Amino acid sequence: MIYEPVTLFVEETPPATNMSVATTDPNPRVPQAERSARMRRRLAQAAYEVIRDTGYVNFRTAAVARTAGVSQGAQLHHFPTKNSLAQAAIDYAWSQATADSLARIAQFVPSDDVIATLMDDSQAFFFSDYFRVALDILMAGGNDRDLRDSLVASTLVHRSRVERLWLETLVEQGWRLPDAEDVLALSMSITRGFAVRALVEPGRERFERLCARWVAIVAQAGLGPTRAAPRASSTRAR
């Protein structure tokens, strides 16, 4: 998030007759835009936490104000409807999940097994509370076309960024683009499917075993690099 710079406005005072002492305001005023952005993020996080803890079917806007520690009037000023709060919760979840994935991608080095690392990142996302909350909103509020459309749009913005970076990482490691696209899509789909299954069948033991088998299948299929991967990690912008 980019904040506007804080500007201090100091009233001019007549020069002192003896000795003037320079003073600064110990409590500079924070610009309205920055205060508004902070409040919106605070409410978005609170909305996410309420849905995570109680489920979207029990989601009440009054609970968001209580969790955020603000008045309902302040909440309504920034998010006047339940849908706008739900959208804010989704945006918060996706931004946090995306930041986590970008950090994992940035830590990847060519000596790592790229498919195993991809599966680790995929598992961290699809088994997270972030994904569970988004899925809960989609399923419980799926009949609301506006909410569904905004959820899909937000998901595409954030997840396409992560998947694009993984695709670039595979290509940088020497993978052919068609193979990289197919393996990336299959890897994500496998993990997503098991994450949904985990909602009714707890435990990850089977998934972890099959995940390791998928990594081995990809290696045995000869779908890996067709050229030597670079030794140094990429300096491209994430």
Outline where the language-model segments fall.
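Amphipathic alpha-helical packing segments from all-alpha helical-bundle domains
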Residues: 98-99, 103, 126-135, 145-171, ...
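Generic hydrophobic, amphipathic alpha-helix propensity
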Residues: 36-47, 64, 89-93, 97, ...
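Hydrophobic/aromatic-rich alpha-helical bundle segments in the mid-to-C-terminal region
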Residues: 147-152, 169-238
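Short helix-capping/turn signature of helix-turn-helix
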Residues: 79, 124, 137-143
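Residues at secondary-structure transition points
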Residues: 27-34, 38, 80, 84, ...
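N-terminal intrinsically disordered/low-complexity leader segments
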Residues: 1-38, 225-238
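Hydrophobic alpha-helical connector segments
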Residues: 84, 88-91, 101-131, 183-187, ...
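Helix-turn-helix
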Residues: 42, 46, 50-84, 88
